[in-house]
Amino acid sequence: MTASPRYWIGTSWKMNKTLAEARGFAEALRDADALRDPAIQRFIIPPFTAVREVKSILSDTSVKVGAQNMHWADQGAWTGEVSPLMLRDCNLDIVELGHSERREHFGETNETVGLKTEAAVRHGLIPLICIGETLSDRESGRAAEILSEQVVGALSKLSGSQKQAQILLAYEPVWAIGEKGIPAEPSYADARQAEIIAVAEKVLGRRIPCLYGGSVNPDNCEELISCPHIDGLFIGRSAWNVEGYLDILAKCAAKLRGDTK
């Protein structure tokens, strides 16, 4: 029996790429499938307009494909929203929830992230729950408190067997993401992720993977993936072209093959 991948490394394209551009990326990734490493689970999160096409192109690979958001309701008068049923209809695997841009610009709260997490699990989607403190949170010494509130809020609506579902966390300090983001020092990220994992374990009764995201690039990916509490990387613009993504995958795979962690 083949062991499940230990690490998750993927990218969300945010509001980028036309259908043709998305298709080109997916085809290039498919054509490079022989380079995959069994220790790494790859995933891609395109915009809604491209998810079905990307999933179709990658259907014969191990790459998981996801959506960047969803509503918690199955259907109804929610103009402009997309339901978990619709994502399942596109054969998607993952749904990204609670990104800081959703929280800041679209009124996402710990409560709504919790509702969406429960709906995702109920419909067999893997929730990738984004959490992270702002610079002011960090400077005021409230980072651990804020992160704990976000983790508990996201997971507290799960009950019974739902707590055994596949769930991913992604620690993305708000000050580290975006074009002007400052990458977190690996030691800082690892310490925060240890705290996040401990909080989630108290809620769920088991350890779940926690990825790091925030200005991940080819220069820092190897040091980050070597940290004991970093279970993968959630990459932004450094992986928006397929060459960049494949480069980071290759560097991490090589590092892990020689790693004893």
From Swiss-Prot:
EC annotation from Swiss-Prot or TrEMBL:
5.3.1.33
**SUPFAM superfamilies listed in its UniProt record:** Triosephosphate isomerase (TIM)
Q: Which molecular-function annotations from GO does this UniProt entry contain?
A: triose-phosphate isomerase activity
| Cited PANTHER family | TRIOSEPHOSPHATE ISOMERASE (PTHR21139:SF42)
General function of this protein: Involved in catabolism of D-apiose. Catalyzes the isomerization of L-erythrulose 1-phosphate to D-erythrulose 4-phosphate.
* Family affiliation: Belongs to the triosephosphate isomerase family.
Q: What is this protein called?
A: L-erythrulose-1-phosphate isomerase
